[in-house]
Protein backbone atom coordinates (compact mmCIF):
# COMPACT_ATOMS: atom_id res chain seq x y z
CA UNK A 1 0.00 0.00 0.00
CA UNK A 2 2.84 2.35 0.86
CA UNK A 3 4.36 1.69 -2.58
CA UNK A 4 1.07 2.67 -4.23
CA UNK A 5 1.23 6.09 -2.54
CA UNK A 6 4.82 6.57 -3.69
CA UNK A 7 3.89 5.65 -7.29
CA UNK A 8 0.88 7.94 -7.11
CA UNK A 9 3.00 10.91 -5.94
CA UNK A 10 5.66 10.23 -8.58
CA UNK A 11 3.01 10.14 -11.32
CA UNK A 12 1.40 13.29 -9.88
CA UNK A 13 4.74 15.15 -9.87
CA UNK A 14 5.45 14.05 -13.46
CA UNK A 15 1.99 15.21 -14.58
CA UNK A 16 2.42 18.58 -12.84
CA UNK A 17 5.86 18.99 -14.44
CA UNK A 18 4.38 18.17 -17.85
CA UNK A 19 1.58 20.67 -17.26
CA UNK A 20 4.05 23.47 -16.37
CA UNK A 21 6.20 22.60 -19.39
CA UNK A 22 3.18 22.77 -21.68
CA UNK A 23 2.00 26.09 -20.21
CA UNK A 24 5.50 27.57 -20.36
CA UNK A 25 6.00 26.36 -23.94
CA UNK A 26 2.72 27.83 -25.17
CA UNK A 27 3.43 31.19 -23.52
CA UNK A 28 6.85 31.27 -25.22
CA UNK A 29 5.28 30.63 -28.61
CA UNK A 30 2.84 33.46 -27.91
CA UNK A 31 5.79 35.76 -27.23
CA UNK A 32 7.41 34.83 -30.52
CA UNK A 33 4.28 35.48 -32.52
CA UNK A 34 3.75 38.76 -30.69
CA UNK A 35 7.26 40.01 -31.42
CA UNK A 36 6.84 39.32 -35.13
CA UNK A 37 3.73 41.53 -35.18
CA UNK A 38 5.26 44.36 -33.12
CA UNK A 39 5.17 47.73 -34.87
CA UNK A 40 8.29 48.93 -36.65
CA UNK A 41 8.52 52.34 -34.97
CA UNK A 42 10.53 55.04 -36.74
CA UNK A 43 10.98 58.80 -36.79
CA UNK A 44 10.67 61.39 -39.52
CA UNK A 45 11.62 65.03 -39.00
CA UNK A 46 10.29 67.78 -41.26
CA UNK A 47 10.34 71.58 -41.24
CA UNK A 48 7.83 73.64 -43.16
CA UNK A 49 7.03 76.90 -41.44
CA UNK A 50 5.26 77.20 -38.12
CA UNK A 51 5.47 73.84 -36.37
CA UNK A 52 1.96 74.19 -34.95
CA UNK A 53 0.65 74.41 -38.50
CA UNK A 54 2.67 71.36 -39.53
CA UNK A 55 1.31 69.04 -36.82
CA UNK A 56 -2.35 68.55 -37.90
CA UNK A 57 -1.75 67.05 -41.37
CA UNK A 58 0.31 64.25 -39.79
CA UNK A 59 -1.45 63.68 -36.46
CA UNK A 60 -4.46 61.78 -37.78
CA UNK A 61 -2.64 59.59 -40.29
CA UNK A 62 -2.99 55.84 -39.67
CA UNK A 63 0.28 54.54 -38.27
CA UNK A 64 1.39 57.87 -36.77
CA UNK A 65 1.56 57.55 -32.98
CA UNK A 66 2.66 61.09 -32.13
CA UNK A 67 3.87 64.37 -33.61
CA UNK A 68 6.13 66.59 -31.53
CA UNK A 69 6.96 70.25 -32.17
CA UNK A 70 10.52 71.38 -31.57
CA UNK A 71 13.69 72.83 -32.98
CA UNK A 72 16.53 71.30 -34.98
CA UNK A 73 19.63 72.32 -36.86
CA UNK A 74 20.95 75.15 -34.72
CA UNK A 75 24.03 76.02 -32.70
CA UNK A 76 22.54 76.53 -29.25
CA UNK A 77 21.66 73.63 -26.98
CA UNK A 78 18.01 73.61 -25.83
CA UNK A 79 16.89 76.97 -27.24
CA UNK A 80 13.54 78.43 -26.26
CA UNK A 81 10.83 79.83 -28.52
CA UNK A 82 11.94 83.47 -28.13
CA UNK A 83 15.56 82.65 -29.01
CA UNK A 84 14.61 80.68 -32.12
CA UNK A 85 12.13 83.38 -33.17
CA UNK A 86 14.99 85.90 -33.43
CA UNK A 87 16.63 83.74 -36.10
CA UNK A 88 19.99 84.00 -34.32
CA UNK A 89 20.29 80.33 -33.26
CA UNK A 90 20.08 78.88 -36.81
CA UNK A 91 17.40 76.47 -35.58
CA UNK A 92 14.38 75.61 -37.66
CA UNK A 93 10.89 75.05 -36.27
CA UNK A 94 10.19 71.40 -37.06
CA UNK A 95 8.07 68.40 -36.21
CA UNK A 96 9.24 64.95 -35.23
CA UNK A 97 6.83 62.26 -36.37
CA UNK A 98 6.79 58.88 -34.64
CA UNK A 99 5.26 56.30 -36.95
CA UNK A 100 4.86 52.58 -37.58
CA UNK A 101 6.51 51.90 -40.93
CA UNK A 102 4.44 48.74 -41.35
CA UNK A 103 1.30 50.93 -41.36
CA UNK A 104 2.54 54.04 -43.24
CA UNK A 105 5.65 54.53 -45.33
CA UNK A 106 8.23 57.29 -45.24
CA UNK A 107 7.25 58.07 -48.84
CA UNK A 108 3.64 58.59 -47.72
CA UNK A 109 4.85 61.06 -45.10
CA UNK A 110 6.93 62.88 -47.72
CA UNK A 111 3.85 63.22 -49.94
CA UNK A 112 1.92 64.80 -47.07
CA UNK A 113 4.82 67.20 -46.50
CA UNK A 114 4.93 68.30 -50.16
CA UNK A 115 1.17 68.97 -50.12
CA UNK A 116 1.44 71.20 -47.05
CA UNK A 117 4.42 73.44 -47.81
CA UNK A 118 5.68 75.70 -50.57
CA UNK A 119 8.91 73.84 -51.39
CA UNK A 120 10.11 76.73 -53.59
CA UNK A 121 10.26 79.26 -50.74
CA UNK A 122 13.56 78.80 -48.92
CA UNK A 123 13.14 81.88 -46.73
CA UNK A 124 9.97 80.93 -44.90
CA UNK A 125 6.50 79.56 -45.42
CA UNK A 126 3.46 81.61 -46.30
CA UNK A 127 3.13 84.37 -43.64
CA UNK A 128 5.93 82.90 -41.51
CA UNK A 129 9.11 84.63 -42.65
CA UNK A 130 12.72 84.04 -41.63
CA UNK A 131 15.26 81.26 -41.70
CA UNK A 132 13.65 79.59 -38.67
CA UNK A 133 10.66 78.83 -40.95
CA UNK A 134 12.56 77.47 -43.95
CA UNK A 135 11.44 74.08 -45.31
CA UNK A 136 13.72 71.09 -44.78
CA UNK A 137 13.73 67.32 -44.53
CA UNK A 138 15.97 65.99 -41.77
CA UNK A 139 16.92 62.39 -42.49
CA UNK A 140 17.78 59.85 -39.77
CA UNK A 141 19.46 57.22 -41.97
CA UNK A 142 20.66 56.58 -45.52
CA UNK A 143 17.32 55.10 -46.59
CA UNK A 144 15.47 58.25 -45.55
CA UNK A 145 18.06 60.40 -47.32
CA UNK A 146 17.70 58.41 -50.56
CA UNK A 147 13.90 58.41 -50.40
CA UNK A 148 13.82 62.16 -49.70
CA UNK A 149 16.17 62.89 -52.61
CA UNK A 150 14.12 60.72 -54.99
CA UNK A 151 10.91 62.35 -53.83
CA UNK A 152 12.32 65.87 -54.27
CA UNK A 153 13.68 64.97 -57.73
CA UNK A 154 10.29 63.55 -58.72
CA UNK A 155 8.61 66.76 -57.58
CA UNK A 156 11.09 68.88 -59.57
CA UNK A 157 10.55 66.78 -62.72
CA UNK A 158 6.78 67.04 -62.37
CA UNK A 159 7.00 70.78 -63.21
CA UNK A 160 4.25 71.37 -60.64
CA UNK A 161 6.17 74.48 -59.55
CA UNK A 162 7.67 77.13 -61.83
CA UNK A 163 10.42 78.01 -59.37
CA UNK A 164 13.27 75.80 -58.18
CA UNK A 165 12.62 73.49 -55.23
CA UNK A 166 14.44 75.06 -52.25
CA UNK A 167 13.67 72.41 -49.62
CA UNK A 168 16.97 71.17 -48.20
CA UNK A 169 17.69 67.57 -47.21
CA UNK A 170 19.85 67.63 -44.09
CA UNK A 171 21.20 65.02 -41.66
CA UNK A 172 19.12 65.09 -38.47
CA UNK A 173 20.82 66.42 -35.36
CA UNK A 174 19.48 66.93 -31.84
CA UNK A 175 15.79 67.72 -31.86
What are these regions (language model features)?
Residues 2-175:
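Flexible coil/turn and secondary-structure edge motifs
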Amino acid sequence: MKNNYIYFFIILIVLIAMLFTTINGSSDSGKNSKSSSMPDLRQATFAGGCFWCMEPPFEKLPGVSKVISGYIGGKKENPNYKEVATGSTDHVEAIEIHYDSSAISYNDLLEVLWRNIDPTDGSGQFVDRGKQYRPAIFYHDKDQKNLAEKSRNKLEKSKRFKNKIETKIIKATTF
